[in-house]
UniProtKB/Swiss-Prot annotation:
Molecular function terms from GO: heme binding; iron ion binding; monooxygenase activity; oxidoreductase activity, acting on paired donors, with incorporation or reduction of molecular oxygen
Superkingdom, taxonomy of origin: Eukaryota
GO BP: sensory organ development
Cofactor requirement: heme
The family this protein is said to belong to: Belongs to the cytochrome P450 family.
Taxonomic lineage of the native organism: Eukaryota, Metazoa, Ecdysozoa, Arthropoda, Hexapoda
InterPro entries linked: Cyt_P450 (IPR001128), Cyt_P450_CS (IPR017972), Cyt_P450_E_grp-I (IPR002401), Cyt_P450_sf (IPR036396), Cytochrome_P450_fam2 (IPR050182)
Reported function: May be involved in the metabolism of insect hormones and in the breakdown of synthetic insecticides.
Protein keywords: Endoplasmic reticulum, Heme, Iron, Membrane, Metal-binding, Microsome, Monooxygenase, Oxidoreductase
Main location: endoplasmic reticulum
Residues bound to heme: C448
SUPFAM superfamilies: Cytochrome P450
Record protein name field: Probable cytochrome P450 303a1
C-alpha cells in the first residue's frame, strides 16, 4: 500500500511537472516551455538584457517568423498569446470569443477578491457598469461641451501655476521638475466628473496618491506580476513576488476614495439632482433594483480606481513623452509656437473645438507623443472565453491574449524611421492624415472609452505650455530617451529650465 501511494504521488508530480511543457496543438509559435516556469526564464533573460518586455517581443517576432503576427508564451501557469501587428491586434480585439478579461489572484485581489469595476471585468458586470458610467458621466460633461470647459479650466490653472513659479524666480525663467508636471491637472479633469472636486498641486493628499500610483505601476506590468504567475510565491516570498506592495498600494488608494464616497453619502440627499457620478451611483443603490448586487460600495470603489488608472495614467505618461521629445528637439517647439501665434495669437490659450483643426502641426505633435508612449506599452489583457482560433492558430479557453502595440506602431512601412519623434509623418499638404496602422486606442467594443478626453487633455496642455514657455534642457542633464518600464512606460524624471516667452 505504501509503495502504491508513493508511485501515485510520483506519477502525479511528474504529470504536473511535464504535462505543462507540451504546447497545445496549433498554438502560436514561441519559445519552449519548461516545467513550472514555462517560458518565463527566456523572457526574463531577454528582459534583463533589453530592458523592456515589449522589446522581448521584438526578438520573438524576428525569431519565430510567421505572417500572422501572433506569438505564444507560457509564464508560470498562464498561457499567453501576444498580438503584435495591426492586423493581429484588430483580429483579437474584434473576436467575440476573446472578449473576456483574465481571472485569478492578481485581478481579484485588486477589487476585494471579486471581479468588480469596468476595466478588468467582462460579461454582464462589464456591460452594466460601462453603460451606467457612460450614461451618467455625460450629465457631468463627459463627451460633451462641458468636458471641454473642464479641460480648459485645468489648462488655465496649469498656466497660472507655471507663471507664478517663473515670477518667484525673477520673472524670466525657473528650474522645474518635469516628473508629474501635469498629473494633478489631468487627474482633475476626470475627478471633477467623478466626485465634483478638484485638487491643488502640492496638497499632501494628492501627493501621496500620485506616489502610490507611481509605485504601483512601476512594480507590475499588463501581463500581471510575479505572484500572479506563481501564486505560491505570495506565501513564500510576499515582498519579492510583489504581493505585499500590490496589497498596500490598493489599500492606500481605496482609503483615499472611501473618504470621498463617505462624504457624498452624508450629503447627496440634500440635492434634488446628482452632482457627479458618485451621487448617481449612490442614488442607484437607493432605488433598490439591484437584485444581482452590481451596485455595491465595493463596485463604486472599483469603478473609481479603474477610472483613475485608465483615465489619468495613460494621458500623463503620453504628456511625459511629449515634453521630453520637445525638450530634445527645440525646433519643434518653435514651429508649433509660430503656428499657435498665427492662428490663436497670444491673448488667449488655444481651445479644442475652436482651434484644433487650424493647428495641424500641434495636433500632430500630440499624435506622435501617443505613438511614442504606446510603442512601449501593452494593451489591457483579454481572455479566451472558449476554445477558439486566431488566424488558424488554436487558442485554448482561458488563454490570456494581449496586444503589444509596439509591432503596430514601429512598423517602418507605416512609420518610416519609427524610433524618431517626427510630427511631420502625419501631415500631407498641410493637413492631418493618419497612417492605417495608427490605432493606439484599440478596436471594437473595448476601444478606450476615454480617448476623446485623453486627446483633449494632450492638445490643451501641450499647446498652452508651448504658447507661453520654452522648455530648455539643462546642460549636462539632457533627458534620457530610454523609458522606465512598468504597467505603462514612463519617462525617467528630469529637470528643465522653463523660460517665459515675451508676450
Amino acid at each position: 500500500m505504501f509503495y502504491t501511494v508513493i508511485w501515485i504521488f510520483c506519477a502525479t508530480l511528474l504529470a504536473i511537472l511535464f504535462g505543462g511543457v507540451r504546447k497545445p496543438k496549433r498554438f502560436p509559435p514561441g519559445p519552449a516551455w519548461y516545467p513550472i516556469v514555462g517560458s518565463a526564464l527566456q523572457v526574463s533573460q531577454l528582459r534583463c538584457r533589453l530592458g523592456m518586455f515589449c522589446k522581448v517581443i521584438d526578438v520573438f517576432a524576428r525569431q519565430y517568423v510567421n505572417p500572422y503576427g501572433f506569438y505564444g508564451l507560457k509564464i508560470g501557469k498562464d498561457k499567453v498569446v501576444i498580438a503584435y501587428t495591426n492586423d493581429a491586434i484588430s483580429e483579437m480585439m474584434t473576436n467575440e470569443d476573446i472578449d473576456g478579461r483574465p481571472d485569478g489572484i492578481f485581478y481579484r485581489l485588486r477589487t476585494f477578491n471579486s471581479r468588480l469595476g469596468v476595466l478588468l471585468t467582462d460579461g454582464e458586470m462589464w456591460v452594466e457598469q460601462r453603460r451606467f458610467i457612460l450614461r451618467h458621466l455625460k450629465n457631468f460633461g463627459f463627451a460633451r461641451s462641458g468636458m471641454m470647459d473642464i479641460v480648459h479650466n485645468e489648462a488655465t490653472c496649469l498656466l497660472q501655476d507655471l507663471k507664478d513659479k517663473v515670477l518667484k524666480s525673477g520673472g524670466k525663467q525657473t528650474r522645474i521638475e518635469m516628473h508629474d508636471l501635469t498629473s494633478v491637472y489631468v487627474l482633475n479633469t476626470l475627478w471633477c466628473m467623478l466626485s465634483g472636486r478638484r485638487y491643488e498641486p502640492g496638497s499632501p493628499e494628492i501627493t501621496q496618491l500620485l506616489e502610490t500610483f507611481f509605485e504601483l505601476f512601476k512594480n507590475i506590468d499588463m501581463v500581471g506580476a510575479l505572484f500572479s504567475h506563481f501564486p505560491l510565491l505570495r506565501f513564500i516570498a510576499p515582498n519579492f513576488s510583489g504581493y505585499n506592495g500590490f496589497v498596500e498600494s490598493h489599500r492606500s488608494l481605496y482609503t483615499f476614495m472611501s473618504k470621498e464616497i463617505e462624504l457624498h453619502r452624508l450629503t447627496y440627499k440634500n440635492y434634488d439632482e446628482p452632482r457627479d457620478l458618485m451621487d448617481s451611483y449612490l442614488r442607484a443603490q437607493d432605488e433598490g433594483n439591484d437584485e444581482k448586487g452590481m451596485f455595491s460600495d465595493q463596485s463604486l470603489l472599483a469603478i473609481c480606481l479603474d477610472m483613475f488608472l485608465a483615465g489619468s495614467e495613460t494621458t500623463n505618461k503620453s504628456l511625459g513623452f511629449c515634453f521630453m521629445h520637445l525638450v530634445l528637439q527645440p525646433e519643434i517647439q518653435e514651429r508649433a509656437f509660430q503656428e499657435i501665434k498665427e492662428v490663436v495669437g497670444l491673448e488667449r490659450i488655444p481651445e479644442w473645438s475652436r482651434d484644433r483643426t487650424k493647428l495641424p502641426y500641434c495636433e500632430a505633435i500630440t499624435l506622435e507623443a501617443v505613438r511614442m508612449f504606446m510603442l512601449h506599452t501593452f494593451g489591457i489583457p483579454h481572455r479566451a472565453v472558449c476554445d477558439t482560433r486566431l488566424s488558424g492558430y488554436e487558442i485554448p479557453k482561458d488563454t490570456m491574449v494581449i496586444a503589444c502595440f509596439r509591432g503596430m506602431l514601429i512598423n517602418p512601412v507605416d512609420f518610416p524611421d519609427p524610433e524618431s519623434f517626427n510630427p511631420d509623418r502625419y501631415l500631407f499638404d498641410g493637413h492631418l492624415k493618419l497612417p492605417e496602422a495608427f490605432n493606439p486606442f484599440g478596436f471594437g467594443r473595448h476601444r478606450c472609452m476615454g480617448d476623446l478626453l485623453g486627446r483633449q487633455n494632450l492638445f490643451m496642455f501641450t499647446t498652452t505650455v508651448l504658447q507661453n514657455f520654452k522648455m530648455v534642457a539643462i546642460p549636462g542633464q539632457v533627458p534620457e530617451e530610454v523609458p522606465l518600464e512598468g504597467a505603462t512606460a514612463a519617462v525617467k524624471p528630469y529637470d528643465i529650465m522653463l523660460v517665459a516667452r515675451e508676450q
